[in-house]
């Protein structure tokens, strides 16, 4: 699984999210709970209706607050500005960065199929990135930038569902 290296300009994301504490280990459970709420309350449709983004695609990202151990997890869409954002939404300005873009292996999530395999493929892709790809690559993780997951039309009830993981990178010193 080789990534594509891209330079991506900064962009704005608006959507719904939660505050969680990474240091206390609640992060994974809190995000799973948020996803259930997101789907149960049909927040995706509401978000598209209110924000009217120029392109289909959801962005999942985590913005850490290093001093407190807290983080904001946001699931949103890319918008041109924040003029249509409502009080119950969160916003993030994602800065320009160089990214290694990984596309997950395809999974069948067509109608009636369990989504758990897709979730596991996403988790295993993250593991691969940090445990296998980074150590053997000419790159290091750029901790000053944000990573994010991107879910476009290729991840909605298809026999070949995939999504992309954008990991900020910079060239390893002495490469």
Describe each model-derived feature in a short phrase:
Residues 1-175:
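A solvent-exposed interaction/effector surface
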